[in-house]
C-alpha cells in the first residue's frame, strides 16, 4: 500500500514536470538542417534540443491520423521501433534500435489527441510506469516529448509536422546530433508515407 502511494506520488510529479512542447510558438528561432521535400529544423526550448520535420503528403488527414494513433502497430510502420506495448489507454512503452555501436533507446509516454476543424494533433510526454522498468541494453529517454500535427490543405493533401525532443542521452556524441536529427526526421516521414501506400 505504501509503495503504491509512493509510485502514484512520483507519477504525479513526473506529469507536473514533464517536458511539454505546447509552448513552442511561431516566433521561436529555428536553425534549418534541411530544406527540400522534407524540411528539418532545430531549436532550443527549455534547454532541450527540439527538432521538427515537415512535409506534405498527398493523402487525406483522416487516413494519416489512423496510422499515427495506432501505436501498437509502430514496429510495422517506423522501422527503428522494435517494440511498442500499450500500458494503459493513453500510455505506451516504445523501444528503439540504434545504429551500431550505440545502445538502444526506450521511453514511456502519455499521449493526448485533439481534433479541430482542419487539424489533428497527437501530443506526448514522458511518464514513468511500474510495468516498464528500465531494460538492460537500453537508455531510457526520460524527457521524451513530441507532437504530430496534421493540417488539411484540401481533401487530398495534408501538411504533416513531427516535432520531438532530440536529446539522445547515453553515449551518443554531441558532434553527431545534427546528422542523427536529419536521419530521424527523414526516416519518420519516409516510413509514414510508405505505410500509407500499402
Model regions and ranges:
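Hydrophobic h-region of N-terminal signal peptides that target proteins for export
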Residues: 10-18
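A short acidic/glycine-rich loop-to-helix N-cap element
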Residues: 132-140, 166-187
